[in-house]
C-alpha cells in the first residue's frame, strides 16, 4: 500500500514509518512534489487534520494526476495537541506555535520548541496539578474520496524540568502515564509503541485492513 503523509517534518515521518511498518510505503509531500504552504486555520485538531488531508488529496487526485500515476491509495494527515488540565486544555490546537502566539521568547525567536517547553514550565510554576495529555487526530482520505478520522490519546503529566535528549517538541517535559521518564528519555522504540501518534496510527492501520 502506498500512502502520502501530509507532512515534510522529518521527525514525524520517521516516527510514522516506524509505526506503520514495512508493509506500507509512506511518501512525504516532497516525494509527490507538493510545495504549497498549508495554513492551519482550523479551530480544532479535527479541523486542521481534515484541512491538511483534503488539500493534499485535491492536489493529487483533482488538480494533477499524480495520485493515479503513482498508484497512491490514499492520503493522511495528523494534528496533535498537548492539553494541560490546569491550563484549561491549553495549548491544544495552538501547541506548535504556542510561545509565538503568546510572544514568549526566552530562548530567542528562532527556538520554537524550546520556547514552547519553557512556556509550559513557566505556566505551571506553583501549581500541583500537572496532569496533561497528548491527543492526535488522523484524517485519512482514500483515493476515491472516502474519509475517516481516528484519534490517539496518551495521558501523563508535565515534568518539573526538561529531561532527556531524544524525541522532539514537548517530549523532554512530558511523562507518559505508567512511566517515570519523559518521552525524550525513553528509547525511541518504546515511545513509538505507546505515544499518542502511535495509538492514532495503530487505529489507522487497523482500519485499513
What is each stretch, according to the model?
Residues 2-4, 10-209:
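Anionic-ligand binding patches
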Amino acid at each position: 500500500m502506498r500512502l502520502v503523509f501530509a507532512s515534510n517534518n522529518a521527525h514525524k515521518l520517521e516516527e510514522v514509518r516506524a509505526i506503520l511498518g514495512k508493509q506500507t510505503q509512506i511518501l512525504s509531500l516532497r516525494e509527490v512534489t507538493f510545495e504549497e504552504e498549508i495554513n492551519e486555520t482550523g479551530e480544532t485538531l479535527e479541523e486542521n487534520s481534515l484541512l491538511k488531508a483534503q488539500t493534499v488529496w485535491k492536489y493529487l487526485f483533482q488538480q494533477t494526476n499524480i495520485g493515479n500515476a503513482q498508484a497512491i491509495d490514499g492520503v493522511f494527515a495528523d494534528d496533535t495537541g498537548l492539553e494541560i488540565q490546569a491550563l484549561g486544555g491549553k495549548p491544544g490546537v495552538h501547541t506548535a506555535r504556542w510561545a509565538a502566539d503568546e510572544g514568549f521568547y526566552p530562548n530567542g525567536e528562532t527556538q520554537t520548541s524550546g520556547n514552547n517547553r519553557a512556556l509550559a514550565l513557566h505556566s505551571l510554576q506553583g501549581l500541583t496539578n500537572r496532569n496533561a495529555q497528548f491527543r492526535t487526530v488522523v484524517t485519512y482520505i482514500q483515493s476515491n474520496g472516502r474519509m475517516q478520522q481516528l484519534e490517539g490519546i496518551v495521558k501523563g503529566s508535565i515534568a518539573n524540568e526538561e529531561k532527556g535528549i531524544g524525541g522532539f517538541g514537548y517530549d523532554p517535559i512530558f511523562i507518559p502515564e505508567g512511566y517515570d521518564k519523559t518521552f525524550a528519555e525513553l528509547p525511541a522504540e518504546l515511545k513509538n509503541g505507546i505515544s499518542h501518534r502511535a495509538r492514532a496510527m495503530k487505529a489507522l492501520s487497523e482500519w485499513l485492513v
